[in-house]
């Protein structure tokens, strides 16, 4: 299928790429929790920033190429500050990996979660992204940045109607089960 780069967030997943090291590379996914996100994806996915250097060392010992870092602060994020924080931490990790000779991390995936209006008001996307663009300037020269703006692009295109068949409260928030 031509897919050559995959995302991992733990040593067990990284080890799975050892047999495919000649054909595939990985991004290390970091966790930056944002409890203000409608869906806090870093609760489920990503390693702590402190785990990056040990993961890079493991990748080197396995012969697995690490192309860069990845994070996704959540879905429907109202404020850009968690992106700014995450980019700053990633910039430091990229510099550290380069300075130590562990890896040339040339790619940063900043995820998605860019907000859309669901009947309420949100910042215009240019305003929302202004501090993110500023933070990206702190990245080492030559780092390529990609994003995953799925909701922002596809969200306004349709409406889904479902029947709620159940609900549960978890960590102070309601979860609804649909048909």
Predicted features and spans:
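Conserved alpha/beta-domain cores
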Residues: 1-118
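C-terminal active-site-proximal or functional interface alpha/beta core segments in diverse enzymes
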Residues: 78-179
